[in-house]
Amino acid sequence: MRVTIPALSLLDLVPVRTGQTSAQAVAASLQLARVADELGMRRVWYAEHHNMPSVASTSPPVLAAAAAMATTRIRVGSGGVMLPNHAPLTVAEQFAALEAIAPGRIDLGIGRAPGSDPVITALLRSSGVGSDVDRFPDHIIDIISLLSADGASLRLTSGQEYRVTSTPAAASVPQVWLLGSSDYSARLAARLGLPYVFANHFGAPGLERALEHYRSAYEPSEAHPVPVTMLTMNVVVAETAEEAQRRALPQARGFARLRSGRPLLAMETIEAALAAPDAELDAAAAAVAAQWIVDAPAAAAARIRTLATTHGVDEVMLSPSAGSYADEPMDAAPGREATLRLLVEALSAA
């Protein structure tokens, strides 16, 4: 079975549920990557989030390396590396090494959000909270140069030229993408001639306007002579719409907790969420899930096709947000796997 139009990819935050270890959560995510590979999905990316009880995706390049070794065909990478948290040379070296491990299969998705709270942000950044954000465009250019065969050229105070490369003898380079959910990110991607991902899974407004800005201002680059767009979305698919709603409840409540400032917890099981109704939290969770695609296979496939066609995107990246029942194995995510399988089957049959 192979994905046709729209091209589908996988975004994974490596969710952690109650009683699950980080090792088990990573094992479940690697199995999900194998499923995506088997289904013919185009790429799997790992997000960067820190100090969150329900998310184990703290290091995209490490997870991408594991996924590359666990799969055979699918592209792997970051969705994304939050660049203000890292030195450009470090990022370039990490992804050049990944490209050497899995040539022609590596993506470097770059974002500028902190990926955590101000305390963790300060711990991650050695040069001050604001300075790296201010230099974000320059740092992207630096990374692209460092990844190239020629590397980057620095001019020392002595006037001497100093050349830096991310790896001694690269045979190929990762594909660089810019992630965002604002006009700023869209215009920057256009100016740099980079593929653009609108982070629709955050529920941010302005999708249509951002894509319009990107396409109208796009400056062709050698690697990308025409604009390339991707749209992310949270998706839960089950055999029935009712079961999809149940599967969506734990993560929707987790998102609602995050947005309302409540203490963050490991993701509840479906039974625990159903057994502990909370009018305020459940109303907020319903509002969160209303921005997702939560449905039976045929209806979910139709909505994805409509979104892709309406916005003219080249690719749709799915964040499968299905929760787990208490008796399901800790080292697997049957609900998330089923979301991918059912959706690909429905899209292929349409």
Q: Where are each of the predicted segments found?
A:
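N-terminal beta1-alpha1-beta2 module of alpha/beta enzyme domains
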Residues: 1-74, 337-345
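An alpha-helical appendage that flanks or caps ligand/catalytic pockets
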Residues: 2-4, 129-165, 206-314
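Glycine-rich, proline-tolerant flexible connector loops at the mouths of alpha/beta enzymes
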Residues: 43-63, 82, 202, 320-332
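Flexible, glycine-rich active-site loops centered on histidine and acidic residues
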Residues: 4-22, 84-151, 196, 335
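A conserved active-site cap/scaffold subdomain adjacent to cofactor or substrate pockets
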Residues: 182-205, 210-211
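Active-site mouth loops of central-metabolism enzymes
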Residues: 12-27, 79-89, 170-180, 238, ...
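Hydrophobic faces of well-ordered beta-strands that scaffold small-molecule active sites
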Residues: 8-12, 44-46, 76-79, 106-110, ...
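Acidic (Asp/Glu)-rich catalytic clusters
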Residues: 2-4, 37-38, 65-73, 95, ...
